[in-house]
Amino acid sequence: MKTEEGTIAVDNAVYTNIAGYAATNCFGVKGMAVRSMTDGLVHLLRKEAMGKGVRVTFQSDNSIAIDLHIMVDKGVNIRAISASIIKEVRYFVTKSTGTEVSAVNVFVDSITID
């Protein structure tokens, strides 16, 4: 990101951590998810590893696109949760980094059944 004073470089981990934090604070989200390459199963990530459930792609217009892989609680409205996540992630990432978010894509990989 270029400013009048110089260039600011934001590490990819900053974006993934902010996006993961914003998503997991939304109602009905159990946590971030990752699919195992060995067995194909979806695993719930611990708080310190939630960035693994997020992928950030840098666009040619200096904006970013964010893909989120999540687990949700049983009985929640997935459409409503996804809309809430998109709004929260876009807001927190833009507010924290000053980077425009061009897209937030939510992938519900699993539903927890207690």
Ranges and model annotations:
Residues 1-74, 83, 95, 99-114:
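Contiguous, often N-terminal, cationic amphipathic patches that form binding interfaces
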